[in-house]
Swiss-Prot record:
GO terms, biological process: translation
InterPro entries to which the protein is assigned, alphabetical: Ribosomal_bL12, Ribosomal_bL12_C, Ribosomal_bL12_C/ClpS-like, Ribosomal_bL12_oligo, Ribosomal_bL12_oligo_N_sf
Subunit text: Homodimer. Part of the ribosomal stalk of the 50S ribosomal subunit. Forms a multimeric L10(L12)X complex, where L10 forms an elongated spine to which 2 to 4 L12 dimers bind in a sequential fashion. Binds GTP-bound translation factors.
CDD domains associated with the record: Ribosomal_L7_L12
GO function terms (MF aspect): mRNA binding; structural constituent of ribosome
Chain segments carrying region Disordered: 95-129
Family: Belongs to the bacterial ribosomal protein bL12 family.
Pfam families documented for this protein: Ribosomal_L12, Ribosomal_L12_N
Protein name: Large ribosomal subunit protein bL12
Presence of the UniProt keyword Ribosomal protein in the record: yes
Keywords: Ribonucleoprotein, Ribosomal protein
Chain's role: Forms part of the ribosomal stalk which helps the ribosome interact with GTP-bound translation factors. Is thus essential for accurate translation.
GO cellular component, one term: cytosolic large ribosomal subunit
Amino acid sequence: MSATEEILEKLKSLTLLEAADLVKQIEETFGVSAAPAAGVMMAAPGAGGAAGGEEAEEKTEFDVVLEEVPSDKKIAVLKVVRTLTGLGLKEAKEMVESTPKSIKEGVSKEDAEEAKKSLEDAGGKASLK
């Protein structure tokens, strides 16, 4: 097995929290940003002013971000985070305590809205990106 295949296999086994930590370490080590380039979404030639509205309609993958958790609602939100992510208690607790934090990434609009509603019903403040 080549070195790149070994790395890929190790990446597949990372939890969401571990993957987020890895991204931060890569950004710091190599001086790069994981944020997408600003012009990537608007690369269509001849696109007019309506391109922004069309892009928003075409978006099929969403991230659910836990923005804020009131201290009296942490336990309820923690339970929802564990249900949504499948994380263990420790990892979910770290996620809830380090808001804003992406809870689910690259999910359909329906799944993202359902996850957001669950988080808000538990008392947290969530958004879709």
